[in-house]
Amino acid sequence: MASINKLALLSRTLSSAAAQATVKPPVQVFGLEGRYATALYSAASKLSQLDQVEKDLTALQATIRSDKKLREYVTSPIINKKVMATALKEASEKLRFAPATVNLLGLLADNGRLKKLDTVINAYKTIMAAHRGEVVCEVVTAKPLDASQSKQLEGALKSFLKGNESLKITSRVDPSIIGGLIVSIGDKYVDMSIATKVKLYTDVIQTAA
């Protein structure tokens, strides 16, 4: 119950400004990371820090991904939450991060949610892309697509766009899906992988046995 109450008050915690109506993001992002990112968007919007927060988080994400020791430190379950929160606050202030960014890091540390930082950052990026009229699309395939396949897929995906929206595609290779592809575009998710079909058929056979 306490964690739910903290999330309900997240926007006010992130923002030092007086309580105002929540600023709704242009796209809904699900999960715990989505709730943190949505609250961050609302707080940063009120403080006119949307772009600065995205810049801060992008730089921080790149640093953590490239620095193994820092990554282990940030996600360590051993370090005291208050010590971690204080250290992050001091470091982010030295780096001149926006107040909304500083408060987010402190809150994640206080709540023991720093392991979620990478996914929170990705969720915030998704919201900001929608804010700019970009539709983020991730395509997962078993092997890299050639130029012709990529062009055909891009043409098909553009049919989902509306008005002045632009498409931003990221590709990822995951051999475990065997074949086919998995596409997430905006808030839509389509799994056309062979691995999922095999699992479906296996489940049907086991149920019928």
From Swiss-Prot:
Compartments in which it is found: Mitochondrion; Mitochondrion inner membrane
Signal sequence region: none
GO biological process: proton motive force-driven mitochondrial ATP synthesis; proton transmembrane transport
Alphabetical keyword list: ATP synthesis, Hydrogen ion transport, Ion transport, Membrane, Mitochondrion, Mitochondrion inner membrane, Transit peptide, Transport
Cross-referenced InterPro entries: ATP_synth_OSCP/delta_N_sf, ATPase_OSCP/dsu
Predominant place of localization: mitochondrion
Any GO MF annotation of the entry: proton-transporting ATP synthase activity, rotational mechanism
Domain of life of the source: Eukaryota
GO annotations of cellular component type: mitochondrial inner membrane; mitochondrion; proton-transporting ATP synthase complex
Role this protein plays: Mitochondrial membrane ATP synthase (F(1)F(0) ATP synthase or Complex V) produces ATP from ADP in the presence of a proton gradient across the membrane which is generated by electron transport complexes of the respiratory chain. F-type ATPases consist of two structural domains, F(1) - containing the extramembraneous catalytic core and F(0) - containing the membrane proton channel, linked together by a central stalk and a peripheral stalk. During catalysis, ATP synthesis in the catalytic domain of F(1) is coupled via a rotary mechanism of the central stalk subunits to proton translocation.
Family per similarity comment: Belongs to the ATPase delta chain family.
PANTHER family: ATP SYNTHASE DELTA CHAIN (PTHR11910)
Record text on subunit structure and interactions: F-type ATPases have 2 components, CF(1) - the catalytic core - and CF(0) - the membrane proton channel. CF(1) has five subunits: alpha(3), beta(3), gamma(1), delta(1), epsilon(1). CF(0) has three main subunits: a, b and c.
Protein name: ATP synthase subunit O, mitochondrial
Organism: Drosophila melanogaster (Fruit fly)
Gene name linked to the record: ATPsynO
